[in-house]
Structures are given as structure tokens and as C-alpha cells.
Amino acid sequence: MADPGHVFRRAFSWLPSQFASQSDAPVGAPRQFGSTEHLSVEAIAAFVDGELRMSAHLRAAHHLSLCPECAAEVDAQSQARTALRESCPIAIPNSLLGMLSQIPHRTPEVTPDVSEQAKFADDPTRGRRKRR
């Protein structure tokens, strides 16, 4: 069976480049990370926090060795992480705790008005449309 990907890409060639497919992979194929792509904000945070799988970590580390822009983003994320860890503990004001404790746990039960209920097909009070 022929690959329909070229037809799809050609049909949407009028779209701006950020919407167009940048790879020659068939349409619907899993997206692969390209070494020339920049790391996403989520990937940078996961890299700094040590949450990436080993294969993803190695790909990101290789990209960081080649891309000073992403390396600067990782450095900034690391500094932000360190600043948050070294900051003073956050104290919750007692007035806020008091207001939060007054929030009801359940919503009050309100029965809907009969006139506001949806009209269903089997409802005998529902008006019938007449043929013209």
C-alpha cells in the first residue's frame, strides 16, 4: 500500500510552517525527537529534576552539549530550583485556614424547576412539529 503521507503534506502545504509536518515520516507515525529541535519547557524541568528516563536524559544531554540556548534555559531552571529549595518555609495565615474550614463540603440540593427541565422525545407535553 502506498504511503498517503506525501498527499497529506502536499494538501496542507499552504499552512504556515509551524503547522506543517517537518518530517518525512508517514502520517500517524509516532513523533520522534529531532536532535535539532529545542527542548520543551517541560523537558527542561524534567531534566533538571532528574525525572527523565535514561534514554531521554541521554538525548537531552547530547542536545544540551550542542545548543547553548537550551543549555542557558537549563541553567536558569537549575538556579530557580535552587532558589526555591533555599527559600524560607511558607507559612499559611490563620485567617486563611479559618476561611477554608468554613467552606461547605457538599453543595445544597436544589430541585430544578419543572419549566426549566429539558424536553425529551417521549415527553407527552412536548409540542409536535407539523409538516408543511
From Swiss-Prot:
Which keywords does this Swiss-Prot/TrEMBL entry list? Cytoplasm, Metal-binding, Phosphoprotein, Transcription, Transcription regulation, Zinc
Phosphothreonine modification sites are: T36
Report the leader peptide range: none
Q: How is the cofactor bound?
A: Binds 1 Zn(2+) ion per subunit.
Could you state what the record's PTM comment says about this protein?
Phosphorylated by PknB on Thr-36; can be dephosphorylated (at least in vitro) by PstP. Phosphorylation is the signal for subsequent degradation by the ClpC1-ClpP2 complex. Degraded following vancomycin treatment (surface stress) by a ClpC1-ClpP2 complex.
Q: Per its UniProt record, what InterPro entries does this chain match? A: Anti_sigE_RseA-like, Anti_sigma_zinc_sf
Q: What induces it?
A: Total levels of RseA decrease after detergent or vancomycin treatment of whole cells (at protein level).
Tell me the segments the record calls region Disordered.
106-132
Name where it mostly resides: cytoplasm
Where found in the cell? Cytoplasm
Taken from the UniProt entry, a GO cellular component term is: cytoplasm
Subunit info?
Interacts with ECF RNA polymerase sigma factor SigE, interaction is abrogated by treatment of cells with H(2)O(2), detergent or vancomycin (the latter 2 cause surface stress). This probably inhibits the interaction of SigE with the RNA polymerase catalytic core.
Its family remark reads:
Belongs to the zinc-associated anti-sigma factor (ZAS) superfamily.
Functional summary from the UniProt entry? An anti-sigma factor for extracytoplasmic function (ECF) sigma factor SigE. ECF sigma factors are held in an inactive form by an anti-sigma factor.
Would you tell me the protein name for this molecule? Anti-sigma-E factor RseA
Species annotation? Mycolicibacterium smegmatis (strain ATCC 700084 / mc(2)155) (Mycobacterium smegmatis)
